[in-house]
Amino acid sequence: MRAVYLTPSSTFPTEFPSNTLFGAICTGLSDLGYDVDGLISRYPEDPPFILSSTFPYVTAGGRIHHFLPCPLLPPLDVRREEDFDNAKRFKRVRYLHEDVFRDLAGGDLRLADLIAGLGDYAIDRGMLARESKTPVLERDEVEIPHNRINRLSSESEAFYHTYGSMIRNGGYYFLIRFYDTAWEPPVRAALRFLEDRGVGPKTSGGQGQFSLTFGDIAIQERP
């Protein structure tokens, strides 16, 4: 499966769901002169491509560490008190390191065993990895100062609005699969267009800037 990496170079949106990402790509395609209405009309019966939301990745030790959302798993029957505490901790996990995800999705690791041995895993900022030395995404939320006028006193008042984050050791990626390969060059062109312009609601102020790279990733899929 194709992976598209967005490495932020300025304040970047904290989350980028698939519908927002698809809309941004369609905007880029439209600005480049492609038939977006014709593209969208194919989706009920014959989708040209599908894509995921963005997920975090970390660059460390000469490799890219992908993190993926927790797969949907059957409810766990927790009986031991220590497992109950671990299950509560696990509920706060949003992303799994790709190695853990593959083991869970492939059936090599049972959820019950993961919960029972949760103390052997590293959990930081909602990201779970098998080893404590595995880095997690280092990001700091950014507060943007604004001014507003008090209508009663006509005085200027400062307030702060949290927007996105600054990332130091990675970025975000999303997965995309083309069923109609004729659309791959246009989508790549639209992504390059977005790379030049930026993404998100604050691009005019220099936010949402990123560099773009393409790659491949093997994901365990259901038969």
Segments from the language model and where they lie:
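Conserved active-site/ligand-binding neighborhood in enzyme cores
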Residues: 1-223
